[in-house]
Amino acid sequence: MNYYQIDSKNINSSKYEMPHTIEIVNDETLKYIESKDSDIEVFLQNQSNFYAEFPDISLGNLIDRDDVVDYMDVSPHCSSIKAVVSNKVKKILESLSVNPIEYALKEIRIKGFHDHFYLLFVPIILNKDYYFPECEFVDIFDESKKYTFKDVDEYNKNDNGFLTLKHICLNEKYKNYDLLYPREGSVFMSERLINEFDNHYIWALCT
């Protein structure tokens, strides 16, 4: 299966300089995020509980835009919350029978808009599941600088904190996944999911 990073594959994207962003504003959600996501290592050990116990409904404001789109950034940062998505995106995920273990959705109500929107959670994949010889990393400041490593030990010795995955290869467990979120990169989407977004004119700004 072919995959695309959503920051390198436009999905009927507008050409604004900055993405549409939804700011979470309700205290319950903000306090929950602060209490559960202050330490990434602790978070990674409790990902499934994080989704299950997350508030069922959050409140948000659209920042510096007149209208919403189907795929938006979210603020503040929270591990594995990758976007705010429309009901249209939700229906596509369901129609393709994307495995529920690949994502979670929680409702967010956006001030001034009556449409249904959701926080999209994608579980973080740890590098123990990478097949390193076929993974390609690039420098976040200069993507012409490309790196490959024979294993996780070699990666750890050479990681300067500025490397991100550009091409990913995982073990067999993930071969039919549509959504992949490696810890050292951004979200990858399957070609069939991207194509379905194109077919349904999903209006998005890639993050």
Located regions from the model:
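Phosphate/anion-contacting hairpin/loop surfaces
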Residues: 1-207
